[in-house]
Amino acid sequence: VEIFMGSGAYICGEESALLESMEGKRGEPRNKPPFPSEYGFKGKPTVVNNVETLAHSYTILKFGAKKFRDLGVKDSRGSKVFSVSGDTPIPGIYELELGMSVQDFVDDFGDGDTKAVQVGGASGFLVPRKRFGKTSIGYQGKLTGISLPTGGSMMIFNSSRSMYNVLNNYLDFFEEESCGQCTPCRVGCQQLLKGIRAVKRGEKPASYLDKLLKLTDTMKLTAKCGLGQSVANSFSSIVENFREEMIY
């Protein structure tokens, strides 16, 4: 076992950018195909897995698949490790069964005044209070009743939080972490950040938010990797559910 220490770049969560970094190069996504399973680390076929996947593999091999499948719900079997942060009295790391509703999660971890929950970190979706009972945390679909745990990060926001500030922070983060290799992500993140600030200052009309939503659709289709594609998740879910906070 050899451990490579990275510099913490968010883009290196993308598998091919991670391989580039391990080879001593700048962390940038590769063109696909070929995929890492064909041409990976130093040109060799490579399996890239999250450490949690390897941990699950060990427990499944040790205790059997049935014990793992007894956890969770249909199509979302097993458990997942979540980091819980934000407006919660009990922040920390928890292993939870998949399939729970966001309402159940809020009942366990909220502070009694939860306004919204970000499921899956900055790249995930923001779930507003009105959808807590209708949205589950599992592997099926998206916010049509089920929310993807794209990552194990769960951020809780109470009524004291400005959703404009939340989105501004996310976009500032994405602009900083974009590798700059592809135009949709590099320029798109900049324009989204400038756009919401212009609307907030009254320099652009509220309808300009609709143009920004169309821009995120373009980024989702044309960005080279998951970073640029996933910016649309938090942007659209925040703007569509808390539009008034983007304006006033």
PLM region spans:
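Ferredoxin-type iron-sulfur electron-transfer modules in oxidoreductases and energy-metabolism complexes
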Residues: 135, 139-248
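Generic beta-strand/beta-sheet core signal
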Residues: 4, 85-87, 96-97, 108, ...
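Short acidic/glycine-rich loop or secondary-structure boundary segments that cap or lie
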Residues: 92, 125-128, 165
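Short, structural beta-strand-to-alpha-helix junction motif
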Residues: 100-105
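Short, surface-exposed loop/turn segments at secondary-structure boundaries that line and modulate
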Residues: 8-11, 123-128, 217-226
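Short glycine- and Lys/Arg-enriched binding-loop motifs that mark or flank ligand-binding interfaces
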Residues: 2-4, 9, 20, 82, ...
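Hydrophobic alpha-helical positions that pack around
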Residues: 1-98, 109-111
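Terminal amphipathic helices with adjacent charged low-complexity linkers/tails
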Residues: 1, 111-145, 240
